[in-house]
Amino acid sequence: MAKKIDAYIKLQVKSGSANPSPPVGPALGQKGVNIMEFCKAFNARTEKMEKGMPIPVVITVYSDRSFTFETKTPPASYLLKTAAGLKSGSPRPNTQKVGTIARAKIQEIAEMKAADMTGADVEAMTRSIEGTARSMGLVVEG
């Protein structure tokens, strides 16, 4: 018989550096999950990724306080910033542009995120990420 699901917890945790401090500790502590067990498992799963990369994670908590978790791909905004070599997006994206990015690079990001995105095809996902790039103040070339 399958375990009864008690809750889903969605967090964004930096790869390789999950620890019991907020936001991880309070979110898991409220549901009675073993926080250190999650931190060790998450850090082990993300050790090969770039250190400090924000990783969305969905934790499924069961009624017996056990858990499973699924990691997603990093946010498109993070991938765009690293591809363009920026620290942050533009505070005024319509008037103040902060950099440029090639359409080929955006398509590469769309293909990487294809598993987590909802879209008809890679072209539709590419257009979605182009919109994110423009809203960050990036100029799309090509």
Curated annotation (Swiss-Prot):
Keyword rRNA-binding among UniProt keywords: yes
Q: Which GO terms describe its cellular component?
A: cytosolic large ribosomal subunit
Domain of life, per lineage: Bacteria
**Family matches, as Gene3D superfamilies:** Ribosomal protein L11, C-terminal domain, Ribosomal protein L11/L12, N-terminal domain
Report keywords, A-Z: Methylation, Ribonucleoprotein, Ribosomal protein, RNA-binding, rRNA-binding
Q: Which Gene Ontology terms cover its molecular function?
A: large ribosomal subunit rRNA binding; structural constituent of ribosome
Description of post-translational modifications? One or more lysine residues are methylated.
UniProt GO BP: translation
Q: What does this protein do?
A: Forms part of the ribosomal stalk which helps the ribosome interact with GTP-bound translation factors.
Q: Which family does it belong to?
A: Belongs to the universal ribosomal protein uL11 family.
Assembly description: Part of the ribosomal stalk of the 50S ribosomal subunit. Interacts with L10 and the large rRNA to form the base of the stalk. L10 forms an elongated spine to which L12 dimers bind in a sequential fashion forming a multimeric L10(L12)X complex.
Please give the name of this protein: Large ribosomal subunit protein uL11
